[in-house]
């Protein structure tokens, strides 16, 4: 028999406290939180209402015009007595299917609920992984999101990758989302004259220039995207390439050319970011006034809209205004599905305005490479943890990126320090980990992805074995009263899931918001997120612990649950006796039941 809880708002019930916007600038540890009291009413179902009037009586004296509420005999929830025959007919005759990721389905069949990975994996697609077979290998290996870096490649090349990923989803049963990364207006190197890379050796002199070349450029010469580069830089400045992967010292300026001595050798990649330091401080000069979204970026964004990408990651975000401007543009021009906007936190401005940027965005990326070129290296770990915590508090997915397994670009096994770095990001409960050069141009992209997957699974299992249920309070974020109810339902569902040791949380959601609220709580069990649209299903594939399904459903939870149980049991993903908690953004309810 199920136990069902639904929420009403009687006049004596205190309202949730909403955290004022001004509080977002305070450290999380200094904020006090207030819990919404939850009363469990056994074997009873109460409709949610936004009215402030007392809830109706629950005894037999209720109005005779109201349909009687009964517990369903198969233990799957409450159903009106005059609707039971309709529900039975619907369940019996409904033959529509359910869509789930092929790899996840296999994991559930073979190893059960606890085998599923909670941390999501993102792969940057490049020359090493752009073929259909290579993309399929990544999807089989656990790739949840394919990232396209618009710093590299032509739009035609990116279009081909997008269509290959879409074909992979349609033909092979995956739900790989697509993220497009804008180049941004910061200083970048050119394309290295068509070469895939170049090696800078210690003691070599290289020329960085703003000149354009009609023919082949001289040896060891690199073009720079910023016209004011030669004017802003001074002799003695330190030039960092790609967040410090290669370092130069400025030794001479000759007109538009800047001669630099290589002091830390390394690999130079096309379109790599450039920063320069003077007396231990980052030199910003006029490049600080460059727009966040360049004219090229707007053309790339139009391309992304036309191709129907799922996310657009914005580089070098300085303020929330940029995010809001882009979201308005997308809302006016995107066709059908909503495109999520991810803010890349990779500059001093991003950290200064962190809370307002994350609040405005649909997620954030900790771009540690470029961030480490703008703040001292020893501050990067603390910055990462702060960004992850703020994203979690504000219910925004967070991606930890850059140099996770950098050595695997050239070597088949990672360093032990890299494994420890990955495990720390998993312990921080980040939503996703991202490969960059490891998958785009590395020699071992599949092995790098395998390392991310296996380390994530092991650390997550260790967390559960140690019963490290989190006691960190989460601030209230709902603005409307309905949102506050949904938030408390999800908080309660996650806590109940941990305390009762349930096998899975089922979330029926049209927009994906309620699934994200459950994910925010990081319950021990997997979260089955059922949604009606393919685009929402793909976007949910970025968030921690969510297994997104596409399923047509109604506002009748009895019908939805019976249909879901039937379909999942027929495919071997659940079995009779499994304990499940179900929540819905249609009825704002919690139901606890065993699979019949």
From Swiss-Prot:
Mostly expressed in seeds, and, to a lower extent, in roots, leaves (veins and trichomes), stems, inflorescences, siliques, pollen (grains and tubes) and flowers (sepals and petals). It catalyses: pyruvate + ATP = phosphoenolpyruvate + ADP + H(+). Pathway: Carbohydrate degradation; glycolysis; pyruvate from D-glyceraldehyde 3-phosphate: step 5/5. Keywords: ATP-binding, Chloroplast, Glycolysis, Kinase, Magnesium, Metal-binding, Nucleotide-binding, Plastid, Potassium, Pyruvate, Transferase, Transit peptide. InterPro entries: Pyr_Knase, Pyrv/PenolPyrv_kinase-like_dom, Pyrv_kinase-like_dom_sf, Pyrv_Knase-like_insert_dom_sf, Pyrv_Knase_AS, Pyrv_Knase_brl, Pyrv_Knase_C, Pyrv_Knase_C_sf. K(+) binds at residues 149, 181-182. The keyword Nucleotide-binding applies. One of its GO terms (cellular component) is chloroplast. Substrate binds at residues 147, 344, 369-370, 402. Optimum pH is 7.8-8.2. Residues 47-83 are annotated as: Disordered. ATP binds at residues 149-152. PANTHER family: PYRUVATE KINASE. Oligomer of alpha and beta subunits. Required for plastidial pyruvate kinase activity. Involved in seed oil accumulation, embryo development and seed storage compounds mobilization upon germination. Belongs to the pyruvate kinase family. This is Plastidial pyruvate kinase 1, chloroplastic. The lineage of its organism: Eukaryota, Viridiplantae, Streptophyta, Embryophyta, Tracheophyta.
């Amino acid at each position: 028999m199920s136990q069902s809880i639904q929420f009403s708002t009687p006049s004596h019930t205190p309202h949730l406290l909403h955290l004022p916007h001004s509080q977002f600038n305070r450290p999380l540890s200094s904020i006090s939180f207030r819990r919404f009291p939850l009363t469990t009413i056994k074997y009873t179902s109460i409709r949610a209402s936004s009215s402030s009037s007392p809830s109706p009586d629950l005894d037999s004296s209720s109005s005779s015009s109201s349909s009687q509420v009964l517990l369903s005999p198969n233990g799957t929830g409450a159903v009106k007595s005059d609707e039971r025959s309709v529900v039975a007919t619907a369940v019996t005759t409904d033959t529509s299917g359910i869509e789930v990721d092929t790899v996840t389905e296999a994991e559930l069949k073979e190893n059960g609920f606890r085998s599923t990975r909670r941390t999501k994996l993102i792969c940057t697609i490049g020359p090493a992984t752009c073929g259909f077979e290579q993309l399929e290998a990544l999807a089989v290996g656990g790739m949840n999101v394919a990232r396209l870096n618009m710093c590299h490649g032509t739009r035609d090349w990116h279009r081909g990758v997008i269509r290959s990923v879409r074909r992979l989803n349609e033909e092979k049963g995956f739900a790989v989302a697509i993220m497009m990364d804008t180049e941004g207006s910061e200083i970048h190197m050119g394309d290295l004259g068509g070469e895939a890379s170049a090696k800078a050796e210690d003691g070599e002199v290289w020329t960085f220039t703003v000149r354009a070349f009609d023919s082949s450029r001289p040896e060891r010469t690199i073009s720079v995207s910023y016209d004011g580069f030669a004017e802003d830089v001074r002799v003695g400045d330190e030039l960092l390439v790609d967040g410090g992967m290669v370092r130069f010292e400025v030794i001479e300026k000759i007109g538009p050319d800047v001669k630099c001595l290589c002091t830390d050798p390394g690999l130079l990649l096309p379109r790599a970011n450039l920063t320069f330091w003077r007396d231990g401080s980052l030199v910003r000069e006029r490049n600080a006034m460059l727009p966040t979204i360049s004219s090229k970026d707007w053309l790339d964004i139009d391309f992304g809209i036309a191709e129907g990408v799922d996310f657009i990651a914005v580089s070098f975000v300085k303020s929330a205004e940029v995010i809001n401007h882009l979201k308005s543009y997308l809302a006016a021009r995107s066709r059908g599905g909503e495109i999520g906007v991810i803010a890349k936190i990779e500059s001093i401005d991003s950290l200064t305005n962190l809370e307002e940027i994350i609040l405005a965005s649909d997620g954030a990326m900790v771009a540690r490479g470029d961030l480490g070129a703008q703040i001292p290296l020893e501050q990067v770990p603390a910055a990462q943890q702060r960004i992850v915590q703020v994203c979690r508090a504000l219910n925004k997915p967070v991606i930890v990126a850059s140099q996770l397994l950098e050595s695997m670009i050239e070597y088949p096994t990672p360093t032990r320090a890299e494994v420890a770095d990955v495990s720390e990001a998993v312990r921080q409960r980040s939503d996703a980990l991202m490969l960059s050069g490891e998958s785009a141009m590395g020699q071992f992209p599949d092995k790098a992805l395998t390392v991310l997957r296996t380390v994530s699974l092991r650390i997550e299992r260790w967390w559960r074995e140690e019963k490290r249920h989190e006691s960190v309070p989460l601030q209230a974020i709902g603005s409307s009263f309905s949102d506050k109810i949904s938030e408390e339902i999800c908080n309660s569902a996650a806590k109940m899931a941990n305390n009762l040791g349930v096998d899975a949380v089922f979330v029926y959601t049209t927009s994906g918001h309620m699934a994200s609220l459950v994910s925010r709580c990081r319950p021990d069990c997997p979260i089955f997120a059922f949604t009606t649209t393919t685009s929402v299903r793909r976007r949910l594939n970025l968030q921690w612990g969510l297994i997104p399904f596409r399923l047509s459903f109604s506002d009748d939870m009895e019908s939805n649950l019976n249909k879901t149980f039937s379909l999942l049991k027929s495919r071997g993903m659940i079995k009779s006796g499994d304990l499940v908690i179900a929540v819905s953004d249609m009825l704002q309810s919690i139901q606890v039941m065993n699979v019949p």
